[in-house]
Amino acid sequence: MNKTLIALAVSAAAVATGAYADGINQSGDKAGSTVYSAKGTSLEVGGRAEARLSLKDGKAQDNSRVRLNFLGKAEINDSLYGVGFYEGEFTTNDQGKNASNNSLDNRYTYAGIGGTYGEVTYGKNDGALGVITDFTDIMSYHGNTAAEKIAVADRVDNMLAYKGQFGDLGVKASYRFADRNAVDAMGNVVTETNAAKYSDNGEDGYSLSAIYTFGDTGFNVGAGYADQDDQNEYMLAASYRMENLYFAGLFTDGELAKDVDYTGYELAAGYKLGQAAFTATYNNAETAKKTSADNFAIDATYYFKPNFRSYISYQFNLLDSDKASKVASEDELAIGLRYDF
């Protein structure tokens, strides 16, 4: 693939991965390795293997996972390329048995076309608000509990998505189609053999976002909006990067269901020192006029190699145990090892 197309692909990826916090953002994925490249066609393979031990109230749980992804690109001409991407996540929690109930989550499955004016894809992909929550979602394990995204703004299937980078301005937009259902004369979902007509589930919606980088000042701002059925929300975010220091804040407001108001805000800070990185976040949210999230988390990450790290993360749960259940108000300690490939 020629240099023009590579530059286009890199700039588009920067919009999607929150590159403005590179080196401090511990939650993102690393770029994969090119395993094939010839005659304008390339294939990258990437992912992670992550061992995660969670401790709450002295009780342990295995939250380990493996992600594997494939990114294929084909040059059509000097300003146009085709792209396909798949990522799956495998998790296991056997509860001390040789169980067969492990799960595979198809996180991404999409294909599309890109060029000078951005990239358009269809399939299971991110909505437009993920790049806004990336401002404060910078920790190795905890964080991002107060900026809840409605389904159409998150990672979902049956979605037509666009992303583009125009100088210092990055934009994203997505539209999710309602899912077709076969129904009988009474409107009940049935097999197509017994159906009288087609209907849909009413889960269509859209999301929009934009991020602007103020040159080399280290200052970035972002805004986004999403709407789906009886749900809607908007988000505003800002960040400042000064060498090895990073600060960010996010505010969100909307309705998670009809007459169910939701308001949240997140604050994040990070510091990189040699091969170590330290991050902290505060999250607070209110759902239906009741506090649904209130926590402070801090973690430390050490890179033995660029693709191998260890981390320890602790979340102080500030929810009142008299108003929330004992389980919902517990603190959490997490210890992890992560290998990126």
UniProtKB/Swiss-Prot annotation:
One of its GO terms (molecular function) is porin activity. Keywords: Cell outer membrane, Ion transport, Membrane, Porin, Signal, Transmembrane, Transmembrane beta strand, Transport. The keyword Transmembrane applies. This is Outer membrane protein U. Residues 1-21 form the signal peptide. It is a multi-pass membrane protein. It comes from Vibrio cholerae serotype O1 (strain ATCC 39541 / Classical Ogawa 395 / O395). GO terms for biological process: monoatomic ion transport. One of its GO terms (cellular component) is pore complex. Belongs to the Gram-negative porin family.
